[in-house]
Amino acid sequence: MKTTYFYLGAFLLCLTSCKKEVKIEEKTIIEADTVPEVTTTTENPAEPMDSVAMHKAWEEYATPTEPHKRMTSETGTWNEDLTFWMSPNDKNPQKYTATAEVKMILGGRYQEQKHKGKMMGMDFEGISTLAYNNASQEYTTTWIDNMATGMMIATGKFDPSSKSTTFSGEMVDPMSKKSKKYRQVVTIIDNDTQKMESFDETPDGKEFKSMEILMKRKK
């Protein structure tokens, strides 16, 4: 009998609870109907890249490709003939000679060039790096030397038809202290000969050829 009363009490308790839940739900529905609808928009977050795709992307980014092979083929010692023009109408350009040691660094991912020579009666040293970015599919070159305290950085793309890479960059003019644009064109003449042409700007923004370096591989 106690068991019967127990189950009966439990049944009544459940029934009461159900009625309370129904009343609460009805009250909630009624109250919801009286509340004005508010529309909100949320931006969908970018879906996270799965670990496999991420690993593949970084592996492709880090693996040397065909442009790196071409850079590797330039390893060696190069003799350089340098010509400088100070202005568009310079009839007496300055000429110097130098040598460059070219090698690949960091597992064949970057090219390093170390230049040495004599300029204006002083020892000259310069270091340049060349990188090919697999992600952006463009080249980046940097330049520093012992006759300045700034770094020149330029980017460009290779044109297979002309076998040349055109770089564009900006530098601060030591005279005006203002930024100005410059352009460089590196042309592959043959496996052992290259030409680098640098174009500067006059104060009024006109471009002129300011430097040429003819590089020949030492055999």
Specify the residue positions occupied by each region the protein language model found.
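Amphipathic/hydrophobic helical signal segments and adjacent flexible N-terminal regions
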Residues: 3, 19-91, 218-219
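Sec-dependent N-terminal signal peptides
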Residues: 6-13
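C-terminal motif of bacterial Sec signal peptides marking the signal peptidase cleavage site
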Residues: 15-17
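Asp-box/BNR beta-propeller blade signature and adjacent active/binding-site loops
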Residues: 45-49, 53, 152-154, 180-184, ...
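A short acidic/glycine-rich loop-to-helix N-cap element
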Residues: 62, 177-178, 202-210
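Central antiparallel beta-sheet cores of small beta-barrel/beta-sandwich binding domains
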Residues: 81-183
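Residue-level recognition of beta-strand termini and adjacent short loop/turns
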Residues: 106, 188-192
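Low-complexity, intrinsically disordered Gly/Pro/Thr-rich segments
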Residues: 192-204
